[in-house]
């Protein structure tokens, strides 16, 4: 038996087949002490790293027709390497998605030497609350559904990566969100897709996003440091991203 705890006259023990109980100290003989160690090997997450500076722009696409503006949008930029069109919304808490992704859009961008990382969001269409994001991400099966559909859509239109823009993550949802990023990163690696994750500017009230862990499992961690003023700000300032 293995001694689990010692008391004044009794010892709590566990047998080899897992049965736990108590025996008197005097009933135990041939006591032997052993140091038990367990080798922990941290999982190695491979990553994709570009050999150039990423200059990424989000393209706010709200309908299929808006995809036709890709040529104009690229022409208005200089030094652009990556477009992140807002194509994907999480439709419901079961993990289904709605998509306006376009293979023609991707094909044109590639001809201009611009990569496409399609953006998936938990707001502005479909689910759009902390409660709904928690209901989605706190279930393994729902995360799996979401990831499966994201990968399938990415491969269908030929994008180079997936950009995650989840802005409705509560404190209690943080651990489930990070598990989602871990699981998605594995599937992205298996399919040669870049994984980038968008974040608020780091503050004490958004530590649940766990940027340190993101940095281990994702390819790129993005800080949305817009030089703009929010709606309702007491001060006047720029509002354009």
Regions found by a protein language model. Name each.
Residues 2-5, 14-53:
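Boundary regions of SH3-family modules and the immediately adjacent low-complexity/disordered segments
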Residues 37-42, 64-72, 100-105, 145-150, ...:
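Alpha-helical scaffolding within the catalytic cores
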Residues 55-59, 81-86, 115-120, 160-165, ...:
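Structural recognition of the beta-strand scaffold that forms the well-ordered cores
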Residues 66-91, 149-162:
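Catalytic domains of carbohydrate-active enzymes, especially glycoside hydrolases
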Residues 84-85, 104-141, 150-157, 161, ...:
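Substrate-binding cleft and catalytic face of glycoside hydrolase catalytic domains
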Residues 86-91, 120-138, 166-171, 202, ...:
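Aromatic-lined carbohydrate-binding surfaces of glycoside hydrolases
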Residues 87, 145-176, 217-235:
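Active-site groove signature of glycoside hydrolases
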Residues 93-97, 174-241:
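Substrate-binding surface in catalytic domains of secreted glycosidases
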């Amino acid at each position: 038996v293995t001694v689990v705890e010692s008391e004044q006259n009794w010892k709590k023990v566990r047998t080899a087949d897992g049965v736990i109980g108590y025996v008197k100290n005097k009933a135990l003989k041939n006591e032997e002490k052993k140091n038990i160690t367990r080798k922990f090997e941290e999982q190695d997450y491979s990553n994709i790293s570009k050999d150039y500076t990423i200059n990424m722009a989000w393209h706010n696409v709200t309908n299929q027709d808006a995809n036709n503006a890709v040529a104009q949008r690229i022409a208005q930029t200089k030094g652009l390497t990556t477009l992140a069109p807002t194509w994907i919304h999480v439709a419901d808490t079961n993990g289904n998605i709605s998509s306006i992704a376009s293979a023609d859009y991707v094909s044109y961008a590639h001809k201009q030497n611009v990569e496409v990382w399609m953006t998936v969001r938990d707001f502005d269409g479909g689910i759009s609350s902390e409660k709904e994001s928690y209901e989605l991400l706190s279930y393994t099966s729902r995360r799996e559904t979401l990831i499966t559909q994201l990968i399938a859509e990415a491969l269908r239109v030929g994008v180079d990566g997936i950009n995650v823009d989840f802005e409705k993550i509560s404190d209690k949802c943080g651990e489930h969100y990070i598990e989602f990023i871990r699981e998605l990163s594995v599937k992205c690696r298996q399919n040669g897709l870049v994984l980038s994750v968008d974040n608020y500017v780091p503050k004490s009230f958004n530590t649940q996003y766990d940027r340190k862990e993101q940095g281990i499992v994702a390819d790129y961690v993005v800080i949305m440091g817009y030089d703009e003023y929010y709606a309702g700000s007491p001060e006047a300032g720029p509002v354009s991203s």
